[in-house]
């Protein structure tokens, strides 16, 4: 599979000017150009704006199509990519912002009407973070938290992501307002008349990783998804630091997946000090009320298991597929698996137990300031389409590090089967 070439689209116009009586003619002309590009953006044009980051020739080496860019110097980094396809064929992508310069409560949304070749920003949502995008019953939904470790919330859009409902109370999208919650853009799965989505709270002891308690949420497919009473939750499971011979550092960012036996399982990222990477398979009862984990059998070797991943089942190949940030052999001595994100690979399994790497999709030899991570993806016929939190060179000093990404990129991986 070859990464597609970057095609860059601008979103932001230039800044307004002050002190017009003192500015030079050149500055006045630049200001006029900026206003014209404001108008172009307002009417939905996608041509690159002069001087905008997306129009910068220095981005042509970035793999894929650049959707958004935030320079490291801003202290605002790009996180939580999510992707959905509307019935009319329009692609919708989203991401949030983290880092010392961010409020850790904002999600931006983008639209592509040409199969991912060009993108434009269509909305900014304040009070939404770590969110999945999914389309259900003629509406688009954002489901995640209100901010970093905030309340669990869901929003609805009936105009393709341009405007969104506000989760003000338990009837309008506030699902849990009683504590600290955590998740990522993970799959929302329809199975046996219910929608399923994994979640964690962050209310356990001992800090990051070990404070996550995993659980499964589900709702009737015909229910009003904005009403908290329509969502059912399993019991919440805490991890145990003694698991994996004392190497268990926590579980998080679980995927709801329909197992071969027809039950829904929660496949969770596991923080470990060394390879092989692992996932934890938590079993869920058919009614979604009970979750259970057996540490003797529930840990599975899984390439990329120490970072966020997305698993989806393909009926045509009868395989489970995953796009994950694996630790390739040359990099296994570079540090903890969670800190190695320079290789993106396609993996698959017939049964959720035996996973193999099918091909490397993206790779860079540097592990310190380059990363391909947190990929959300969808089957698109013979291809996989994906959005990626990408740390890469930008001509401005590059990413702060492999983790603190400066790009959101779109990719099409052809003929994945």
Model-derived segments and spans:
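Bacterial N-terminal signal peptides
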Residues: 29-40
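Beta-rich carbohydrate-recognition and catalytic domains
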Residues: 45-80, 84-130, 134-184, 188-249, ...
């Amino acid at each position: 599979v070859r990464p597609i070439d970057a095609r860059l689209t601008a979103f932001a116009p230039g800044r307004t000017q002050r002190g017009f009586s003192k500015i030079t003619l050149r500055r006045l002309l630049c200001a006029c150009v900026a206003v014209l590009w404001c108008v172009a953006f307002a009417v939905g044009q996608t041509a690159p704006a002069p001087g905008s980051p997306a129009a910068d020739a220095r981005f042509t080496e970035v793999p894929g199509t650049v959707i958004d860019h935030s320079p490291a110097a801003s202290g605002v980094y790009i996180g939580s990519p999510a992707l959905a396809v509307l019935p009319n064929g329009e692609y919708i992508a989203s991401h949030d912002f983290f880092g010392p310069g961010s409020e850790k409560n904002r999600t931006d949304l983008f639209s592509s009407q040409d199969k991912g070749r060009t993108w434009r920003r269509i909305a900014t949502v304040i009070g939404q973070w770590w969110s999945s995008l999914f389309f259900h019953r003629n509406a688009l939904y954002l489901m995640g938290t209100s901010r970093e470790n905030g309340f669990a919330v869901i929003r609805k859009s009936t105009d393709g992501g341009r405007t969104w409902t506000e989760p003000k109370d338990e009837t309008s999208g506030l699902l849990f307002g009683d504590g600290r919650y955590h998740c990522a853009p993970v799959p929302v799965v329809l199975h046996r008349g219910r929608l399923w989505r994994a979640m964690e709270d962050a209310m356990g002891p001992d800090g990051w990783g070990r404070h996550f308690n995993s659980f499964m949420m589900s709702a009737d497919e015909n229910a009003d998804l904005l009403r908290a009473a329509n969502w059912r939750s399993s019991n919440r499971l805490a991890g145990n630091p003694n698991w994996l011979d004392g190497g268990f550092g926590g579980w998080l960012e679980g995927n709801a997946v329909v197992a071969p036996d027809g039950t829904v399982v929660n496949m969770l990222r596991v923080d470990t000090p060394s390879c092989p990477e692992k996932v934890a398979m938590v079993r869920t009862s058919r009614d979604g009320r009970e979750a259970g984990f057996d540490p003797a059998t529930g840990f599975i070797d899984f390439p990329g298991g120490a970072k966020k991943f997305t698993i989806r089942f393909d009926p045509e190949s009868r395989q489970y597929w995953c796009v994950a940030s694996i630790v390739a052999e040359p990099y296994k001595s570079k540090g903890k698996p969670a800190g190695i994100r320079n290789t993106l690979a396609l993996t698959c399994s017939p049964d959720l137990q035996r996973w193999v790497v099918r091909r490397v999709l993206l790779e860079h030899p540097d592990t310190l300031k380059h990363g391909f991570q947190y990929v959300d993806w969808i089957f698109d016929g013979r291809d996989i389409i994906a959005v990626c939190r990408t740390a890469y060179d930008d001509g401005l000093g590059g990413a702060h590090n492999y983790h603190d990404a400066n790009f959101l990129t779109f990719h099409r991986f052809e003929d994945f089967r």
